[in-house]
């Protein structure tokens, strides 16, 4: 017997490939996992912290939500980070980086520890047009 595709059973099995990274943040009382432009984004204290993308490069890794003034110090501490080629205000850790897993864990720990270089205030949502 064939099963219908896309049912509750199929949805239940879909796990984001970067879920293991944000799991370290889930026990924080302020943690919220949202969606933005086809990505998953972790909020702490209402701030955008880390964005998880699983599409084609350059949208296949982690974007660190930060201000441009913080780029140099974050790139020095987390060597594979670089400005995102499209969204240059944020830093990017490509999943293809040799140290992706190690750096991803360190970034999540820094976000959880409230590293002041990580996190931006979300922009206001535009109201829907009538």
Could you tell me what each predicted segment is?
Residues 1-8, 122-130:
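Short Lys/Arg-rich cationic patches that frequently serve as NLS/NoLS or arginine-rich RNA/DNA-binding motifs
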Residues 23-39:
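Short acidic, Pro/Gly- and aromatic-enriched capping/linker segments at domain boundaries
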Residues 6, 30-31, 96:
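Residue-level detector of alpha-helix boundaries and kinks
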Residues 67-128:
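Short, structured beta-strand-loop surface elements
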Residues 35-86:
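Short, conserved beta-strand/beta-arch hydrophobic-aromatic motifs that form part
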Residues 1-24:
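Short, compositionally biased leader-like segments
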Residues 22-24, 61, 92:
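Intrinsic disorder/low-complexity segments enriched in polar/charged and small flexible residues
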């Amino acid at each position: 017997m064939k099963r219908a595709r896309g049912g509750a059973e199929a949805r239940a099995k879909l796990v984001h490939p970067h879920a293991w990274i944000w799991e370290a943040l889930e026990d924080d009382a302020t943690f919220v996992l949202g969606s933005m432009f086809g990505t998953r984004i972790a909020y702490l204290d209402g701030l955008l912290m880390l964005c998880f993308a699983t599409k084609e490069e350059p949208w296949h890794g982690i974007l660190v939500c930060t201000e441009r003034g913080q780029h140099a110090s974050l790139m020095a501490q987390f060597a594979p980070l670089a400005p995102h080629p499209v969204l240059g205000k944020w830093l990017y850790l490509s999943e293809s980086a040799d140290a992706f897993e190690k750096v991803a864990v360190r970034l999540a720990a820094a976000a959880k520890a409230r590293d002041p270089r990580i996190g931006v205030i979300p922009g206001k949502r535009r109201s829907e047009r009538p």
